[in-house]
Amino acid sequence: MNKLRKVLDIIEHKHLDAIIVLSDYNRRYLSDFTGTSGALIITPKKQYLITDFRYIDQATEQAQDFEIINRKSSLISEIKSILERENLSNIGFEGHLISYDTYVELNKGLITLISISNEIDKIREIKNKEEIQLIQKAAKIVDQTYEYILTQVSIGMTEREIKAKLESKMLELGADGPSFDTIVASGYRGALPHGVASDKRIEK
């Protein structure tokens, strides 16, 4: 069962007319669109990806199951315009991921917002064959990068220099980029739970 089919099952089970997806990672997961601005509207009959002019070509190439909307106004205004035009009123949304201000703005008008917190996250918990292969590829890149950096670190290097070498090697091996800030913390900084690389030098 593909990702969109599972979202349509949520729509049916929750008696919704549509689901709005605003979070970056759920938008990317469901549409394959990697741009940093946009929203999805998923209905039983049609799927929309709303973005701005900078990403139209990219969205068209990546999100082939979606109708691409080049927004002319704010993202929320464009969403509401489509919902009104398509006569969609019972709307699922990521209640645990959007701000209060966004909720208030969406809630103006003749729609009913219904939180589907964690429902899309549950879909993402079960990996398909392609996703498993990508995880295995990522793990291999991390292993190879770690072995490489052990041969590169020397006394006097800064944490930032090590970070740069790590990330450069990961890209060389085929990574798109780090999932989060690369953690490099030495000496007394090693106790930090999320030690973002600094100008501290490696000591003996």
Language-model features: where?
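Short pre-catalytic strand/loop immediately N-terminal to key active-site residues, enriched for Gly-Thr
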Residues: 69, 132, 197
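Flexible, acidic/His-enriched mid-domain "rim/lid" segments that flank
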Residues: 4, 45, 77-178, 189
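Basic, ligand-binding patches in group-transfer machinery
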Residues: 184
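Short helix/loop capping segments that flank catalytic or ligand/cofactor-binding pockets
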Residues: 29-30, 58-59, 101, 192-195
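Short acidic, glycine/serine/threonine-rich loops at helix termini
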Residues: 61, 104-105, 125, 194-197
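N-terminal accessory/capping or targeting/presequence segment of soluble
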Residues: 1-82, 140-141, 200
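Residue-level signal for pocket-adjacent positions within structured domains
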Residues: 22-28, 54, 118-121, 178-179, ...
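Acidic/histidine-enriched ion/cofactor-binding microenvironments in catalytic or ligand-binding pockets
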Residues: 42, 84-85, 178, 191-204
